[in-house]
Amino acid sequence: MSAPHNVLTKKNPRRGRFAFPRRRVRAGSIDEVVQLLRLPANIANGIHTRHKKCWNDFRGGGGGGGGSRVDGTRAFVDLYGLGYLCNRTNSTLADYLCTLFVAEAYRDACCAQPPAPFPDYNASPPDCRPPLPPQPPCKPNDSELLDRIVRQNDLILNGLNQLCLNHSNHHFELSNILNSIKLQNVNIINQLSQIFDDGVLSGLDEKLSRLIADLDGHFADFGSALDAALAQLQDSLRNDLTNINSILANLTSSLTNINSTINNLLQTLQNLGLGEVGAKLNDVQSTVDRILGVLTPEIVAAAAAAAAKRAH
């Protein structure tokens, strides 16, 4: 496969900023790469400016003549910029462009030639000019080096393909999630529209106001009934407590009267002299016993035996 001829590249023979030896930095046209890969025109805005050059930059470095017909504002990118652009699509053409770019850079490094000097318009006559030094011959291509480069490029391309695949998978997952969210939003909007169309929410304020008014009326009635029940309960408790106090007062007075009666009875018994009456009764009983012993001794003996048994 040959390189596409419409991919314009330019060599920059300037020395690197890190004091590397003189080398040629290859750059590719942004417009033609974007056109080949069918990318949007503004995708190059994501490339840092240090990886982009214009035609005037190459001319300032001695890479082009004053009679070039190429547009001076035309932009170019280095290997990093080309990799950035090729990573935005998943195609064999992007892989081929990266491989061709690296291969040409290695080939130029192997076959490096000093840049052609600018013509000296104030030079001396031809007889007085010193002879030009001979140009070194181009080194032959080293197949082993190229094979190694090919393997490295394959590894790089495999990594880029894997990154592109992962990016595509993540993009697909995010797209599915966004689509599901959009579908849910559409369903919710449709349901809300259906609710508003059916007029379900039209009389909701009135219904809620009526319900609140009914609840307020029920709560007021319940409060009144509860207050009446509590007042009635208080009256009943008050009456019951009054009756209990009356009963306790009556009991207290009755106990006081009973106590007074008992005291009076005790006083009366003390005044009667029961001790003398008992002594007189004992005398009468002893007299009767003597009479009975004289008249009926058997009865007296039986009574004495019964008394002895009771004593045992």
Swiss-Prot record:
Q: What is the species of this protein?
A: Lymantria dispar multicapsid nuclear polyhedrosis virus (LdMNPV)
| Predominant localisation class | virion
MF GO annotations:
structural molecule activity
User: What keywords sit in the KW lines?
Assistant: Membrane, Viral envelope protein, Viral occlusion body, Virion
Please tell me one Gene Ontology term that the record gives under cellular component. membrane
Q: What does this protein do?
A: Major component of the polyhedra envelope.
Name the domain of life this protein comes from. Viruses
Q: What is this protein called?
A: Polyhedral envelope protein
In Pfam terms, one family for this protein is Baculo_PEP_C
Keyword check for Zinc, yes or no.
Answer: no
